[in-house]
Every structure is written in C-alpha cells, then in structure tokens.
Amino acid sequence: MKDKQFAIPKATAKRLSLYYRIFKRFHAEKIERANSKQIAEAIGIDSATVRRDFSYFGELGRRGFGYDVKKLMTFFADLLNDNSITNVMLVGIGNMGHALLHYRFHERNKMKIIMAFDLDDHPEVGTQTPDGIPIYGISQIKDKIKDTDVKTAILTVPSVKSQEVANLLVDAGVKGILSFSPVHLHLPKDVVVQYVDLTSELQTLLYFMRKED
C-alpha cells in the first residue's frame, strides 16, 4: 500500500487490513461504537497497540465515546483502496497457484485475479479456469499487462525462477508483487514486494508451541 498522507511503521501497516476486517464485522453485527479494548480483543493484541496505531491517523475517536464503527470502516476502506476493484495477475499455476485461482478474493474484498501465466508449453495454457480466468503463456506477459494495465502480481513459481520472473514483471510495468517464494527479490526501490513464506510461518508456530510445553 502506498499512501502519501500518513507515514506509519511497517508493523502498523500490516495491521490495517485486520482493523478493516474487524470494523466490517462490527458493522455487519450492527455495532455502532467500539472502544479500543473491544477492537484489541477481536484482533488478539493489547488496547495500547490499537490506540498507538490509530494515533498515526489523527483523531479517529473521542475519549469516553469510542470509535464510530461505520466511520472507521469507511476510513480503512479508503486507506486500503477497497472502494474499487483492483485487478491482479497470477504467475505460476502449480499447486499453490491453483489454490489461489480458486479463491474468490472478490467476494471478500475488492481484489480480482483476471489472468494467469505459466510456461508456454504448460498443458493449461490457452484454457480458462471454471471462473473464466484465462491462462496464458509467459511469452505473452508484456502484451497482456499492457492491454490490461495490471500493476499487481502474485508470484507462485519455483524459487530458482522467482528472480527471473520478477524481473520480467517489473520490465512489463508491475509495481507490486506478492511472492510465495522464500528467495529475497532484488528489484527497483519503487517496486513493493511482500513475502509469504509458509514454511517459515509453520516453523515459528512450532517454536511457540514447544515454548509453551
């Protein structure tokens, strides 16, 4: 996410979508006001963290009144650009890629995978998913990005290919990449990269489980 108005710590930025999700849930449950303790309990953090996070955005609530749920839901929707559809592309249709292709992002948030890519000789190239997402060969990637003006990509290719494919995406105009590869990508500073390392997350979980024994 790129926002020129607010300069916030990375840890706070990572919680923005959680706050948005909670306020959407509160709104659906017809809760009109919520205090920092309620928000903290819903997310699993302490209320001081909530207040500190919110302080970066000015006056979002009033002491003794709490936070207006509808107002904050709208605020975070604007902040996360969730008021309009964001088109996304996926590169790599292995097991993880297939799982993501079948995940209906647009039914939960306003993000939509509109096309996918793999090696030109992949058997699924030239076909569509049951939801109508076309699958193209990697050699078409520049033309397709130019036609659709997609700026965001999900990368689910083997680690040994991740840098090569990421370079191709950046050359084609992509400005944001969500990478499922544990390999650190060396890209221009104006390209935003987020990493999802499932193995690392699982190892961290197991560490804390052993710590509790």
UniProtKB/Swiss-Prot annotation:
Q: What is its main location?
A: cytoplasm
Q: SMART domains recorded for this chain?
A: CoA_binding
Positions with a binding annotation for NAD(+): G92, I93, G94, N95, M96, G97
Q: What happens when the gene is disrupted?
A: Expression of aldehyde-alcohol dehydrogenase adhE at both the mRNA and protein levels is significantly increased.
**Gene Ontology CC entries for this record:** cytoplasm
Where, per UniProt, does this protein localize?
A: Cytoplasm
**Keywords recorded for this protein, A-Z:** Cytoplasm, DNA-binding, NAD, Repressor, Transcription, Transcription regulation
Pfam families with a match to the protein in the record:
CoA_binding, Put_DNA-bind_N
**Quaternary data:** Homodimer.
Which function does this protein serve? Answer: Modulates transcription in response to changes in cellular NADH/NAD(+) redox state. Binds to the promoter of the aldehyde-alcohol dehydrogenase adhE gene. Functions as a redox-dependent repressor of adhE expression.
Protein name (database record): Redox-sensing transcriptional repressor Rex
Q: Which species?
A: Streptococcus pneumoniae serotype 2 (strain D39 / NCTC 7466)
